[in-house]
Every structure is written in C-alpha cells, then in structure tokens.
Amino acid sequence: MYQFRSVTPRIERYREKVRNRLIIGDAAKEKLKYEAEIRYQNFPPMIQKPMISKYVIENMPIDIQEDEFFVGDMGGKNWGDSHALAWVLMTDIEHTWPILEDGLHHAPMDDPIYSKQLLAIAPEDVKELREIINKKIAANDGIRPEEWLPDGAQEFFALQASDYGKIGGWPVMLPPGHLTPGFQNLLRRGYADIRKEAQDWLDAHEGNVQGDNMGRYMFYKAATIACDTAILLTRRYADLAREKAASCADAEKKAEFEKMAEGLDWIAEKPARNFWEALQQVMMYNVFLKVDNDPGVTSMGRFDQYTWPYLKKDLEEGVLTMDQAQELVDSFFLKINTFYKGGFGKTQQTAGIGHLGQHTTIGGCIPETGEDATNPVSYMVLEAMSRLELHEPTVSLRCGKNTPKEIWDCAMETSMRVGGLPLLQNDEVIVPAIIQELGFDLEDARNFAFIGCQEITGSGCDYPAPNGSAMGHSGIYWAIVLDMVINNGVNPMNGAKAPDKVCSGYLYDFKTFDELKAAYEKMATWMLTWSATLNNYTEFEYPRIYPFPNLSITTTGCMESGKDVSEGGAKYNSYGGTATGLATTADSLTAIKYMIYDKKLISAEEYLKAVLANWEGYEPLRQRIINEVPHYGNADPYADEQMKYMIDLYYGISRAFSTHRCKVYKCGTFGASDHVVQGEITWATPDGRKTGDPIADASSPCQGRDVCGPTAVFVSSTSFDHSHFMDGMALNLKIHPTALQSNDGITKLEDVTKAYFDQGGMEVQYNVVDSKTLKKAQKNPEKYHNLVVRIAGFSAYFVDMTEAMQADIISRAEHNL
C-alpha cells in the first residue's frame, strides 16, 4: 500500500483551525462595492468593472492568520465570507438566527439553506447589508434580464421543469465561470509585462482610435487597471507582512514575515522565482479573481504541471527538501479551504454549502510529447487531501495508458480516506474527443483541465461557460418532461401545462412504444431549445453586465485580440449544460415498455393512475416494477437500450444550439447535488420512484438499483458513447471498505477501472464507505467529524450535509469486488 508522509505540528494546528473555524460574514466588502458602484455608475461597463475592483481592493480589510504560509482572503474576519449579502437576501436573519453570548447572529441547525454550518454575523453587519439591498431594490439597480423576457418565456417558466424558474433572481449574477485562469501565463510573465503589452497598444493609438478599435481601446485600458489592481493587492499584503515583522518578538517568525514581504514585493510585478513564490502568486491571483467575481468558479487548473518546474529548481539548488515542499502544498490546500461563499437559493443547495469548485487537475500527459506527466507534485496534492482529510478542492487524476502504478495506488488510498477523491478521468477518451467536439489543437487538447464539478476545459486558453450564463446548470428536468408527456403536457406537481403544439395525449393514447418516444422527443426538443434560447439571451446581455478583464489579462487570445472573455476573446469558446439523472427517465421508459407494450401486464390507463396517485394504493405494482423490470446499471441490454436512447436524444438535440459568442454547445451528464433538489419538485415517476425522492445522480444508475457489481455498472455505462460529453460526466460508485483492505483488493479495483477505461469509459469516482458507518455518523456526528463523501459534483463532510443528502448517500448500492 502507498505510504503517506507524516503531518507537521504546524500543519496539524492550522488544519484544526480551518476545520473548526466559525465563519463570520461581514459587510465591509459589499459596502465598498456599493460605494464604488455609485462612484463609477456612469463609466463604460468595461472600465467600470475593474475600477470597482480597484476601489474595493484599495480599502478592504486584510489580515494574516497564525500558522499561514500563504496570504490572501475573501473576507476580512477570521477567514470569513465577504459575500454575506446572500445570507441576508435569502434569510430573515434578524428573526431566525439567534444572538448568542458573543453578540453575533448564529445560523441555527434547522436553517433550510445554511443548516449545520458554523456561520455567524454581527447585527450591525446585517443592518448594513439589509440597507444596501433595500437601496438597490428601490433604485432598480443594475441590468436585470428578467425585467424583459422573450415572448413565451413565462409559459416555459410556469412548468417548473428546468433551471430557469427566474433568470438570475436578484441581484442578477450571470456566472462568468466555471473556468481555468491562465496561471501558467501569469507565472511566466508577471503583471508588469502584461500591463506593458496593454499600455504599448494604448500609446500607439493615443488620439487615433478608428473603426473596431474603440472596443480594443476599452479592453486594453481595462487591462492596465486590472494589472495595477492585482499589483496593489499583492503589495498591500507585503506591507502587512512587514508590519507583522516589525512588531514580532520571535526571531524565527520575524524572519519568516520578512521573507514573505520580500517575496510578495517581487511577485507583485514580476514572474515567480521559486516554489513558494509560484504558489503564492497563484493564490493571490485566485483571491484577486474572487474579490472581483462574486459568482464565478475559478479552478486551479493543472496545478502539478505549472508548479513542478519551480520545485524541481529548488530541489536541484538545495534550497528546499521534499518534506518542506509537502508542508507548503499542505498549507496551500488548507488555505483554499478557508475560502467560503454563501450562495443563492438552489445554487447554495445544489453546489454545496460554501463549495467554490476550485477543481485541481493532476497527472495526464505532456502537451508537446504526449508522454506521461506525473511528477512529485502530483503525489503531494493527493497526500495533502488524504492526510488532512479535506473535502475541498475536488481533485481529478488524469489517467492514461502510461500512468504509473504508484499514482494509481496513491489515488486508491486517497479514496479510502476521503470519499470520491480523486476523480479518475480517462485521457484516452477525453483528448481525442476535445479535438473532435471542441476543435482544439493537439497540444491544447493534451493540456486540458477540469473545472467546477467535473467540466472539461482548456488551460487558460478557453472560455467554456459549461453551465451556460443564467441559472443552475442550464438544463431541463428530464423526469418531469416524461411525467408531462404521459399526462398530456401537464406537470402533475403543479398543474402547469405545456403549449398544445407539444402535447400528444395521455399514456393510454400511445398505441406503440415508438409513439411514446416520438411524443417525448417532441416535448424534450421544445424544452431544451427554450433552455438554450434563454441562455443565449443572457449571453447576449453578458458583456455589458459582467465583463471580466481581471480574468482576460491571463487568458490566451484576449490580449492578442483586444477582446474580453465575455466578448469571445479567448482562443476557444463554448457553452453548455448538463442532464442530471437520466437513469430515472431511462428506467421509467424501460418499465413502461416492459409492463405495457412487451409483457402486457397492465393497461396504460391503470399504469398512469398509479403514477398520478404517487403509487398510493398500488404498492404491489410498484414493488413488481422495482424487482422484476430490468434496470440500468446491471449489464442488461434491455434496460441499457433506453439509457442509450436518452443519452443520444440529449446529444442530438443539443447539436443545433449556438450563441453569438460560440458555435459549440457541450453536453454533460453530471450534477452537484441537483438530483436531490430536482427530486423534491418532481412527481412520482413510472420507474416506481415516489414524489419528492431524489432522482438518479449524474450519469449513475438509480439509487440501489445496480445490484450486479461494479463491472456490470461499467458495462451499462459504456453502452453509449462517452466522447460526446465534453461538458463532463460523473459516475458514482460506493465500494465497501472491506473490498480494499489488502493490496490485492486495491489492485483489483485498479484493474477493473482500467478495463472500464479501455472500453471507452470516461470518468468514475469511488465512495469507499459502508452504510453502517454512515448511519453511525448520523447518530454520533462528533465521532465522524472528518468523514468525507462524494455527493455527485462535490465532496463534503458527511456530518455537515442536509438530512436529505445524507439519506441519498446511504441509499446508494454498496459494491464488493
């Protein structure tokens, strides 16, 4: 078995502080942001955006915490949440969060959104944030796409069968993520060199801006402001480190602060020189983007690839040991875990409480040669996640035919310690698919990374908008669509009806199974096309609502073209969405086909009555469907055929979609925890699922229906073409811990996974835990404080999850090998 390093006392202390911290929201940043919005309200959007960032960064409180190796925070209080406006907007904090002895409002354990979180906020901060909200509402502040909508949109919304209940909500937050910033470009150049490129263009065109160049003028001017602001942020921390050094009595700590200040001064403008500076420059840019971009999801990219040259140099020069380097990596990833962002409504529930999607990619291949790229930092990332029992960030290991067995072993051991991490991703499928589906050059395809949950993107050269630009995952709820199709277009959950032009009757009106599928195709095409149309509407508004020059300065293509990422300036552009829980719909179609059309065991009229009755009074029928009808995930072609049908239908419809920014719509079959939230608003389905129960997660089989082991799941999964899904896939499997207690067990799981990859499988993630342990954790959470599990698109501490999400994990089938 893989042997992990020990954890240093300093990292142990730091880890306990991070895990057990009280997250304090504050109004400071939102207040500064509101002041800046008023001050610069008449500026052009491209200039206004970086000017607001500059004002906030000039004035926001900063601090350096005890035991930190790296600096930079989103909030000013105890690694807090500077986005607490979301808390106040979504929650009646004044009347539902009690004030405890420390004088702060604390989130109660039964809060519907922020349950089980150690969150607190001062009454005066709540008051300030409430005043800002009320002022914005009174002024009807900002461009809000929902104020005017394309004809027919309200009819679509009323169905409540998609992520578009209302575009963006209030205030509008069009997510300029998920994405991978150009960390490698920044490390190579530094801010001063990037700024010089922009300033040279401005100097060459001073007083003579003609034709299309006015847009470029605005962009390059914004780029200079962005660079100046990033430099300012880093220098503020350098000055603070010097202040700490001046007042520090401990000689060792004093020297550390002085060295930190010197390094920060250097990387404020120049490229990093060593491993610590590289990590700090990446961290500071990450903070810069988060301060600027409230709703965005900025991932860490190919962390091991862009940091290894600096560590290699330090090791060769003898200025750093491997153990010291591991301590730095440990600290870096603990620091990432201090970033917290409260979200809005469904986003908060589906993306994970405070989850920031800082997906980190390791392994894979060298872009220029295609050779295996695994290096010592690859192992250090896994060691940090496993030894420190971290749930954030998500880590993906890119696996190819030449991936070393040692990193496989390390990955399996990590999965045993922190559920679902790393995600195992198949280079042999993804690299050629990126070229075919997205049009990437070979080197850029080999250099791909993962973002958010498990979406696929280029490394600092791509603006992928993998979940669209509006709401949730920009998708439709496929199980609700089926309920509507068999009920003459009516959603049984709310009584809303689709337009007559896409309604084909009731289940008993379809004389053949092909007629039912034709009706489903008509409804699904109308629904998904509307979803894409609403995304395109918000995409069209996007450049004047949310230009993103702070990101554009490191994104390949933007500085060359003089165009912001929101305007299509990146080298590659795409957008997309995801289909969560297709197995629920596939199993429902299989059940209808089996029970009505093939075996003729029940009439269509009676079957429909059972579904509309939420199976009440029909339990024997429901049990027969569950136990007799074949289900996806068991290597049964009868059931797998319908999953392939659903997958191909989704992909086929989506090929027609495009925006003004790009011509590529990417399909995905993943979700964060959408399947739980979607299930809450989905009526009973023909597969025997009851109203309110979760639908299947991501591209996985329905909970508990995969009963023939992992190999059977893999056979079913590869019944369709994974290469079509360049927005990402997620296949979750729960493995019983006893299966991996020996080296033979670990090797067997590795071999099964490799065989799955050889057959065209793209991704898999393993929760190595048994239901007995999870039930114990429910009863005694204090004994399982650090138990990490994978939901679908993110990992979480089991004891911090809602009861519905805990129940979903427990309900999944356990597999032995």
State what each model feature region is:
Residues Y2-A223, E256-K259, G263-W266, K270-L817:
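Conserved catalytic cores of very large enzyme subunits
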Residues K244-K254:
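A conserved hydrophobic secondary-structure block that centers on an alpha-helix together
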